[in-house]
């Protein structure tokens, strides 16, 4: 019984200490069913992003909304946007390469079959688009 109590206390302490602000790496992806253009942002570093105790990026939907709003302002409306993040750059680069290669492979396969490229992949540089940190509201706790 004491061992179980000790393990539970240790687990709670480690989870509580993990929550808070830390550096995260993220990139964005956008696609639309109405268009054949697919957008990828560069990998970006967010120095003071908030991570809650369940290991989720606080305001993760707001990061996707930032990309959606930027693309809508550029005339690319109705985009479905996804923001992928990780706490290590190597893990994020692996996710980025996997998603990017999947779209390149599909585009090459369909180009050979039909003679026309089904996707146009565009890359957004940090000068064109960069994420801004989402700050936790006063009443909301990330811990």
Model-predicted regions and their roles:
Residues 11, 32, 44-45, 68, ...:
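Short linear sequence elements within intrinsically disordered, low-complexity coil regions
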Residues 3-15:
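Sec-dependent N-terminal signal peptides
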Residues 78-143:
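Surface-exposed, polar helix/loop patches in the mature regions of secreted/periplasmic/lumenal proteins
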Residues 17-19:
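Boundary at the C-terminal end of the N-terminal hydrophobic targeting segment
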Residues 8, 53, 119-121:
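Alpha-helical interaction segments
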Residues 21-80:
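Short aromatic-glycine-(Arg/Gly/Cys) micro-motifs in beta-strand/loop hairpins
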Residues 4, 32-34, 89, 126:
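Generic structural motif
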């Amino acid at each position: 019984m004491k061992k179980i109590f000790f393990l539970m206390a240790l687990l709670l302490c480690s989870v509580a200490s993990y929550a808070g602000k830390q550096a995260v790496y993220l990139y964005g992806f956008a696609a639309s069913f109405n268009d054949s253009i697919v957008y990828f942002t560069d990998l970006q570093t967010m120095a003071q992003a908030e991570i809650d105790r369940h290991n989720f990026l606080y305001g993760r939907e707001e990061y996707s909304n930032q990309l959606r709003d930027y693309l809508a302002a550029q005339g690319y409306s109705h985009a479905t946007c996804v923001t992928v993040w990780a706490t290590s750059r190597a893990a994020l680069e692996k996710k980025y390469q996997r998603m990017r290669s999947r779209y390149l492979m599909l585009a090459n396969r369909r180009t050979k079959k039909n003679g026309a490229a089904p996707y146009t992949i565009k890359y957004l540089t940090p000068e064109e688009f960069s994420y801004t940190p989402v700050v936790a509201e006063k009443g909301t706790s990330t811990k």
